[in-house]
């Protein structure tokens, strides 16, 4: 699924059964980079934002509350999807 399509799906509130790899691709599309992995925690940072994004993969999916946290962060800092 394209980044734009996934973002539209999430914005409509469809937060269940989101593939971890697809969501990581979306997070990276907003300019975040993987800083480190500690166990199941994947920590992403953005060069212009001090707050970090913590994602956990559970059975190949991302936790819905972490999707909500990320969407709030994008809105708070008015970050735009890069490229595609």
Predicted regions and their residues:
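Terminal, regulation- and interaction-focused segments at domain boundaries
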Residues: 2-18
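Polyanion-binding surface elements
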Residues: 13-31
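Glycine-/small-residue-rich active-site loops that bind phosphorylated ligands and cofactors
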Residues: 15, 50, 61-62
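Short, electropositive, low-hydrophobicity segments enriched in small/polar residues
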Residues: 17, 43, 64
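A short, structured beta-strand/loop element
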Residues: 28-56
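C-terminal structural segments of small proteins and small subunits
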Residues: 58-84
């Amino acid at each position: 699924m394209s980044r734009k399509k996934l973002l539209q799906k999430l914005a409509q509130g469809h937060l269940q059964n989101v593939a971890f790899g697809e969501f990581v691709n979306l997070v990276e599309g907003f300019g975040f980079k993987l800083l480190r992995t500690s166990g199941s925690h994947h920590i992403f940072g953005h060069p212009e934002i001090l707050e970090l994004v913590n994602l956990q993969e559970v059975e190949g999916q991302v936790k819905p509350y972490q999707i909500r946290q990320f969407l709030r962060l994008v809105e708070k800092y008015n970050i735009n999807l890069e490229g595609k």
